[in-house]
A protein has these predicted regions:
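Cap/lid segment of the alpha/beta-hydrolase catalytic domain
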Residues: 87-145, 199-206
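N-terminal cap/lid segment of alpha/beta-hydrolase-fold proteins
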Residues: 33-78
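Acidic beta-to-alpha connecting loop that harbors the catalytic carboxylate
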Residues: 242-244, 270-271
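Short beta-strand element of the alpha/beta-hydrolase
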Residues: 70, 80-91
């Protein structure tokens, strides 16, 4: 499968693997939308957690789309605050939704951070098993647009400093984020957790397309590294697990190589769920430093043991 994918990529991107400006702009046009369209934000309720307010909301990315469930986590005060868009993984049902990073967002709020936590299309029950591969292309484009609209919503808040915005995504939340951020480029820092270089790497675990060759051709404009390469003047933290059966060490090298500097790659004694305290502590420290909220940033890696 990877050999076939490589052939497609070379045909589309040329020998260097990097798209020229005109080629990328043609791809970016797939994700255009009307920024003036009403997001139709509706609030279902608000919960106070200490001094932090957690707003339960829905918004409509584009006219006719299904509303997206989200939380907005807001600290006490007028701001301006840093802002972060968080997007969950596809994994355990309990956390395959907007709650995955909620505790982190609440803990970070008093330090000066507004968070928007949204649900992706993969939050639907048995989303992966029910997918129709021939619909992946259209659904992927809609998902990227929905993430761009989520960024619109976050930045529309008068208490959010547009110059201090970040993005955190795990698994599909990171991979669709790579596309959205490569087109959007409004964030100052990114954290991508347990991601691979191509959506195609995870496309064939269940239902198979009628024609794999046709599937690869259709989805070639969605190659994640094309979008990673577009982001300049921003920092990126990649977090990976040493026991991840879905992400190889070679995968981590590919995405790390596609990102611009400054960038950092960290590994943890975890599986794909990345549910270890050090991973959360590191990304929170990264966000605080990169978004101007203080703190020393990532702790240094331990020195190798002497032989």
């Amino acid at each position: 499968m990877r050999a076939a994918l490589l052939a497609v990529l070379l045909a589309v991107a040329g020998p260097t693997g990097a798209l020229c400006a005109d080629e990328f702009e043609a791809q970016a046009a797939l994700f255009r939308y009307d920024p003036a369209a009403d997001l139709k934000v509706e609030e279902a309720g608000v919960e106070k957690q200490g001094t932090v307010s957690v707003h339960d909301i829905r918004f409509t990315p584009v006219p006719g789309a299904e509303p997206v469930k989200a939380y907005i986590v807001v600290p006490e005060g007028k701001g301006p605050f840093a802002g972060v868009l968080w997007v969950h993984w596809l994994g355990e049902p309990a956390t395959t939704n907007r709650t995955q990073f909620l505790k982190e967002a609440v803990d970070l709020a008093p330090k000066g951070m507004v968070s928007l936590l949204v649900e992706g299309m993969w939050s639907a029950p048995d989303w992966y098993g029910k997918r129709v591969p021939e619909q992946d292309y259209d659904h992927s484009i809609r998902q990227v647009v929905a993430l761009r609209r989520a960024m619109d919503l976050l930045l529309s808040r008068p208490d959010v400093d547009k110059a201090r915005v970040g993005y955190v995504g795990h698994d599909y939340g990171g991979m669709y984020g790579m596309m959205a951020n490569g087109v959007d480029r409004r964030a100052r820092t990114y954290v991508y957790i347990a991601v691979v270089p191509s959506l195609n790497d995870w496309a064939f675990f269940a239902r198979q397309p009628v024609s794999k060759a046709a599937y690869l051709r259709q989805n070639a404009p969605l190659e994640l590294t094309d979008y990673l390469r577009q982001v300049k003047n921003a920092s990126t933290l990649f977090q990976f697990a040493n026991k991840d059966v879905y992400v190889s060490r070679a995968d981590t090298q590919v995405v790390m190589g596609a990102a611009s500097t400054p960038k950092e790659r960290r590994f943890y004694e975890a599986d794909h769920g990345m549910a270890v305290p050090q991973a959360a502590a590191d990304r929170d420290a990264w966000l605080l430093k990169e978004l101007g909220l203080g703190g020393p940033g990532l702790p240094p890696l331990p020195s190798p043991s002497p032989r």
